[in-house]
């Protein structure tokens, strides 16, 4: 019997590869099960359209508090996390504890990390804002001391310390917002890794389905009962002066963000639509 071999001819087959970060099994002690809501609320009503059908995932417990103070840790592995677009690092501490942290750009296996007020200004170290010089680039920032990081956690993002006065530090966030944060809050030095995630192509519709994103149907292709743009014979226009949402509100150009209460900690808000 003759075996005939063919070269791959589709972009997905030719260019897709499993990155080195995706070849590690997660630490079992730091994982737990995760149930997808598929865009439904507790009554089963769709509250977020075009969601559902994602690949089954395990949730990795990430240390956003960085409260292992003055204990040296070493990077054991850099791993893929399906629950976020940044990579994560498994840190092996000298006391035997293991924790996951966000992977800073430039950090590799075997590097040393430390969470301490006296830590050096190097990628991955966590220290209070009061100990950071002006111009330091940071990520994984707390809004309240001890609560855990809430800002600048996405892949490739970075904030900068631009001023310190009294008990507050002034930060420039990736969105362009400038806000005040208490100086005793912890932050990690450096930029979040996986900077080129925005350049990654999905290559096929199935890749989107693995991520839990379902197809988006045009309103003009629906029936009138389903969308204000629906109905008509053939490919007709939407029949409206302005495009509308499925719930009948004007969209595409009209500002939809509600007015915000005055927050004295926000010096300049980000640009919003």
UniProtKB/Swiss-Prot annotation:
Keywords per UniProt: Chloroplast, Plastid, Ribonucleoprotein, Ribosomal protein
UniProt-annotated stretches for the region Disordered: 1-51, 213-248
Record bears the keyword Plastid: yes
One of the record's GO molecular function terms: structural constituent of ribosome
Any one GO cellular component localisation term in the record: mitochondrial large ribosomal subunit
GO aspect biological process, one term: mitochondrial translation
Cell location: Plastid, Chloroplast
Record-linked Pfam families: Ribosomal_L2, Ribosomal_L2_C
Domain of life per record: Eukaryota
Plastid is among the record's keywords: yes
Compositionally skewed regions (Basic and acidic residues) per UniProt: 14-24
Family: Belongs to the universal ribosomal protein uL2 family.
Subunit structure and binding partners: Part of the 50S ribosomal subunit.
Protein name (database record): Large ribosomal subunit protein uL2c
Annotated organism of origin: Adiantum capillus-veneris (Maidenhair fern)
């Amino acid at each position: 019997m003759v075996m005939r071999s063919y070269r791959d001819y589709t972009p997905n087959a030719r260019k897709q590869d499993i990155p080195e970060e995706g070849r590690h099994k997660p630490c079992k002690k730091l994982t737990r099960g995760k149930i997808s809501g598929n865009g439904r609320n507790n009554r089963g009503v769709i509250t977020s359209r075009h969601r559902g059908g994602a690949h089954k995932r395990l949730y990795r417990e990430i240390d956003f508090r960085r409260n292992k103070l003055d204990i040296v840790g070493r990077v054991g592995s850099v791993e893929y996390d399906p629950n976020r677009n940044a990579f994560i690092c498994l840190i092996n501490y000298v006391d035997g504890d293991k924790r996951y942290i966000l992977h800073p750009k430039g950090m590799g296996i075997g590097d040393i990390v430390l969470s301490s007020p006296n830590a050096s200004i190097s990628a991955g170290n966590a220290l209070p804002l009061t100990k950071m010089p002006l111009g330091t680039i940071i990520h994984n920032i707390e809004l309240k001391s001890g609560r855990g990081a809430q800002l600048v956690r996405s892949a490739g993002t970075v904030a900068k310390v631009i001023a310190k006065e009294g008990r507050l530090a002034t930060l420039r966030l990736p969105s362009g917002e400038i806000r005040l944060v208490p100086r005793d809050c912890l932050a990690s030095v450096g930029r979040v890794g996986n900077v080129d995630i925005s350049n990654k192509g999905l290559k096929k519709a199935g890749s989107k389905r693995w991520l839990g994103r379902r197809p988006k149907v045009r309103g003009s292709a629906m029936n009138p009962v389903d969308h204000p743009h629906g109905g008509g014979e053939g490919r007709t226009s939407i029949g409206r002066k302005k495009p509308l949402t499925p719930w009948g509100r004007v969209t595409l150009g009209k500002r939809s963000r509600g007015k915000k209460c005055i927050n004295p900690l926000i010096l300049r808000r980000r640009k919003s639509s």
